[in-house]
A protein has these predicted regions:
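PRPP-associated nucleotide enzymes
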Residues: 1-186
Length: 188
């Protein structure tokens, strides 16, 4: 039996300005906890992790003068729910123009939820080589983990229920900038 979700309320969690300030803080944390930018590279998980990783790299460049490599990772083939994605999932290519071997990698995504996306991303990275270290940076951590995965860099922790949805909207993809919590009521 299929459950339908009806949105009862939308509550803004972050405005465009707050997203900008949060990304600045995260960029500084990444550099500080990495002991600088040596061997550092950012890898955005397609879709919304990509513009977030690019913005983090720009902030690092603006503050340190160092161009940190940025890559894009498509995890479609590594998902454990591929059969539920659809009969013909769209596969994009990875765009990682640097060796991941012995790199200090920071995976970047918009929302951390069950951890399954991150597990798939790590599998994809290990197929490309052997990084020195992999850490995770997320804009929102909403809890409800199904995997033993924890973010090293978190923009905001948000307590949610399983019926709520965290929607990240970024200007590069959505034409607007905000993070919203959709509070719904599941019914049959």
């Amino acid at each position: 039996m299929m459950r339908e979700m009806r949105v009862v309320e939308k509550r803004q969690l972050l405005s465009a300005e707050e997203i900008g300030r949060t990304l600045q803080r995260l960029a500084h944390e990444i550099v500080e906890k990495s002991g600088g930018t040596n061997d550092l590279a950012l890898v955005g998980i397609r879709r919304r992790g990509v513009p977030l990783s690019q913005r983090l790299a720009k902030t690092i460049r603006d503050s340190s003068g160092v161009n940190v490599p940025v890559g894009t990772l498509d995890i479609t083939l590594y998902r454990d729910d591929l059969s539920t994605v659809g009969p013909q999932p769209v596969i994009h290519s990875n765009e990682i123009d640097f060796s991941v071997d012995d790199r200090d990698l920071v995976l970047v995504d918009d929302v951390l939820y069950t951890g399954r996306t991150i597990r798939a991303a790590m599998n994809g990275l290990f197929d490309l080589g052997r990084p020195k270290r992999i850490r995770l940076c997320v804009l929102i951590d909403r809890g409800h983990r199904e995997m033993p995965i924890e973010a090293s860099f978190v923009g905001r922790n948000v307590e949610t229920s399983d019926t709520e949805i965290v929607e990240v909207r970024l200007k590069e993809i959505d034409g607007e900038e905000r993070v919203v919590l959709e509070i719904g009521r599941a019914h049959v």
